[in-house]
From Swiss-Prot:
Lineage summary: Bacteria, Pseudomonadati, Bacteroidota, Bacteroidia, Bacteroidales
Gene name linked to the record: xylI
Name of protein: Endo-1,4-beta-xylanase A
Residues annotated as signal peptide: 1-24
Domain GH10: 25-371
SMART domains hit by this protein: Glyco_10
Active site: 160 (proton donor), 265 (nucleophile)
Induction annotation: By xylan.
Family according to the record: Belongs to the glycosyl hydrolase 10 (cellulase F) family.
Annotated pathway: Glycan degradation; xylan degradation
Length: 376
């Protein structure tokens, strides 16, 4: 183990001096190296899908063969009022993917967060009836999925429906329809586009309670003949969580249901969490404290090396099980694009992605490419 660490650190130093230049000259890229392993994807924001962030666009085109919409397909954006859809940004996103021959992922159809305020309530703010919510869900899902039928490879149909302990999250959807809202969402999506792949996506999937609940949910869907193609394991990870062994246990457990695995929303935070138990709960918010923002001017060398080793270890795991995984998606192009800078505490400086704030590949990119090239 000690020898492995020494070798990795030596490689990291070497790549930090040479990889950016080599990367530019020899045509190396993540998507080329991973071509026969799995899709390598990235979330894009509207500045990128519109072409305004030119440097980011070049990174995306060179390194990634799949894209997912970071925000523009969430209901609060695409369907802000019951009888009003805003398709402009989503249309632009899909066109960007098509023009660059990418596998396009729709994110997400049913999610309790960033939910259009009208969706589950009447004009007085009271919960609508089960019949009304079913109708609204079907209209929302059918309208969006049919619009992009044949153009989007797959959809995150339901997002983050399970708690760490395995209980169903007490969302408006659950309050009104119970757990039945999940099979209904998958049913409506399949009816709208029978050829589209359908996914369930969630965070903290290494938690045993969530692992067991997701396995049960997927098995129940399959027993009922409801299509589900893959489980998305969000990769919002830290330097000391989750244990790679627990993450691997979940991968194998999910694969045991007969569906494929997707590593989604991958980022590795290097700054401390004000609460280690928030997972990736977007509603979490803490007041800024200077001591919780330890690296505003850059990472110390030892911290950078440790980050490189940890990210490389996860990619080594993904490559080990590339027969089970169909896609690995980063949650952002370069460090300055990451939501981690403002969650769960606004105004911090984090370094969670594969490309730095100057749009340069980090040393780990070279290590991933090397690892992919030697993986059978």
């Amino acid at each position: 183990m000690k020898l492995k660490r020494i070798i990795l650190l030596l490689l990291t130093v070497m790549f930090s001096f040479s990889y950016g230049e080599v990367f530019a000259k020899d045509g190396s890229s993540l998507k080329k190296a991973l071509k026969n392993k799995f899709l390598i994807g990235v979330s894009v924001n509207t500045h990128q899908s519109s072409g305004k962030d030119v440097a980011a666009v070049e990174i995306v085109k060179k390194n990634f063969n799949s894209i997912v919409a970071e925000n523009c397909m969430k209901s609060s954006v695409i369907h802000p009022k019951e009888n009003k859809y805003n398709f402009a940004q989503a249309d632009e996103f899909v066109s960007f993917g098509e023009s660059n021959q990418m596998a396009i992922i729709g994110h997400c159809l049913i999610w309790h967060s960033q939910l259009a305020p009208w969706f589950c309530v009447d004009k007085d703010g009271n919960n609508v009836s089960p019949e009304v919510l079913k109708k609204r869900m079907k209209d929302h899902i059918t309208t969006i999925v049919k619009r992009y039928k044949g153009r989007i490879k797959g959809w995150d149909v339901v997002n983050e429906a399970i708690e760490d302990n395995g209980a169903y999250r007490k969302t408006k959807f659950y309050e009104i329809l119970g757990e039945e809202y999940i099979p209904l969402a998958f049913q409506y999506a399949h009816e709208a586009d029978p050829d589209a792949e359908l996914y369930y996506n969630d965070y903290s999937m290494a938690q045993p309670g969530r692992r067991e609940a997701v396995v049960k949910m997927v098995n129940d869907l399959k027993k009922r003949g409801i299509r589900i193609d893959a489980i998305g394991m969000q990769g919002h990870i830290g330097m000391d969580y989750p244990k790679i062994s627990e993450f691997e246990k979940s991968m194998l457990a999910f694969a045991g249901t007969g569906v494929k695995i997707m590593i989604t929303e991958l980022d590795l935070t290097v700054i401390p969490s004000p609460n280690p138990n928030v997972g990736a709960e977007v509603s979490a918010s803490f007041e800024y404290k200077k001591e919780m923002n330890p690296y505003p001017d850059g990472l110390p060398e030892e911290v950078s090396k440790a980050w490189t080793e940890r990210m490389n270890d996860f990619f080594r795991l993904f490559l080990k099980h590339h027969n089970l995984i169909t896609r690995v998606t980063l949650w952002g192009v370069a460090d300055q694009n990451s939501w981690r800078n403002d969650w769960p505490m606004r105004g911090r400086t984090d370094y969670p992605l594969l490309f730095d704030r100057n749009y340069q590949p980090k040393p780990v990119v070279g290590l991933i490419i090397k690892e992919a090239e030697k993986t059978k």
